[in-house]
Swiss-Prot record:
The lineage of its organism: Eukaryota, Viridiplantae, Streptophyta, Embryophyta, Tracheophyta. The active site is at residues 251, 259, 293. A lipid is attached at residue 2 (N-myristoyl glycine). It comes from Oryza sativa subsp. japonica (Rice). This is Probable staphylococcal-like nuclease CAN2. Signal peptide: none annotated. Its cofactor is Ca(2+).
Length: 368
């Protein structure tokens, strides 16, 4: 715990600086000052009064964090007052402090300014929901770091030709897999591409829900969850934490699986569930289709999912929209081996089935 002990002693090197910060869901954040009096400029470091442990008023939050981490290492107890600022359970808070303690020990030199401490907390707890993160920072009276811009790490030259962007999802729920070629995925808003694009309305809904839960107004909290869903976002429980995530409807590029009501439709969906259910996936997005779905190539545990679906006879090659020769080859291999849907000899094409269904509905309307 050398870093934590050094925090109480202070450091005279003067090498620290404040990076630029701007609040997101708290747009009116200002440093505290006495009502009716203008905030006085900070005195030079050597002129500031030193409090207990040699801590200046401007660094009291840094010292409090160090004290709480030292206490947590000895007792495994989180600060009593933290629950008034966050909504997640005590068990989740313990996990946060385990991560914070590890990050603090690995930081050299230890954080000596509020800005440094805020950055450490934001990095160590980058997977918790934004409202909880802001609650912890508020608890220690630390500034709220600005979110990274969407283009800060974006390198389109490294992406395959035609790929617009990449999604790294949370584990895919089995119930979110609709059939053998489509599913709904959620991407955490801590992802750099997502973080800068979360609407202010969504931030406000999350904060309002947090306040409602603190007041035990669970009916209002549930209503706010519904509003989040309508905005295309969801709060997802992840390892005792809650993560704010954006919803994406995904269509797998280049394949067409039997519809659920077709022969082999349920088997095709089951095959996809076995491949990605409960797992995180990487999606290389090419475009948006007419139904608002993101069309892309899917990878999971180093497997190319379209390849697995085609090779095992769980889907057709959708030649109309994808001319990749390897897709045609994988389908031929499955046909030759009578795998999956090809075991029936002459399976109906899904696009033909959908056309017949549309025509049947139109005929029924005309007869009526």
């Amino acid at each position: 715990m050398g870093n934590i002990l050094r925090c109480f002693k202070g450091d005279d090197d003067g090498g620290d600086h404040y990076p630029y910060y701007k609040p997101t869901s708290r747009p009116h954040y200002q440093p505290p000052h006495y009502h009716g009096q203008p905030a006085a400029p900070p005195a030079p470091l050597q002129q500031q009064h030193l409090g207990p442990h040699g801590v200046t008023p401007s660094t009291v939050g840094v010292a409090a964090l160090a004290h709480d981490l030292l206490n947590f290492e000895s007792t495994s107890m989180v600060p009593d007052g933290l629950s008034q600022h966050v909504v997640s359970s005590r068990k989740a808070q313990v996990k946060w402090y385990q991560k914070l303690l590890e990050a603090y020990k690995n930081t050299t030199p230890p954080p000596k300014t509020p800005a440094n401490a805020a950055q450490l907390i934001a990095r160590a707890l980058n997977m918790i929901q934004r409202a909880d993160l802001e609650g912890i920072l508020e608890f220690y009276n630390l500034p709220i770091p600005s979110l990274p811009t969407a283009s800060s790490n974006y390198q389109p030259s490294l992406l395959p030709e035609g790929v617009q962007f990449v999604l790294n999802t949370l584990p895919v729920y089995d119930k979110c897999i609709g059939d053998g070629d489509g599913f709904t995925a959620y991407v955490p808003t801590t992802d750099p591409r997502e973080s800068a694009n979360v609407p202010l309305e969504v931030h406000e809904l999350v904060i309002a829900r947090t306040q409602a839960r603190k007041c035990r107004d669970y009916q209002s909290a549930d209503a706010l969850l519904s509003s989040l869903d309508e905005a295309g976002y969801k709060i997802i429980s992840c390892s005792d934490d809650e993560v704010l995530a954006r919803k994406y409807r995904i269509r797998m590029r280049g394949i067409d699986a039997p519809e659920l009501k077709m022969p082999y439709g349920k088997e095709s969906r089951t095959a996809l569930v076995k491949l990605i259910g409960g797992k995180s996936v990487k999606i290389y997005v090419y475009d948006l289709d007419q139904f608002g779905r993101y069309v892309g190539d899917i990878y999971c545990n180093n497997l190319f999912i379209q390849e697995q679906m085609l090779k095992n006879g769980h889907a057709w090659h959708f030649k109309t929209y994808d001319k990749r020769p390897e897709f045609a080859r994988w389908e031929r291999e499955a046909r030759a081996a009578n795998r999956g849907l090809w075991a029936s000899g002459n399976p109906e094409k899904p696009w033909d089935w959908r056309r017949d269904q549309r025509n049947a509905r139109q005929d029924a309307i005309q007869v009526y």
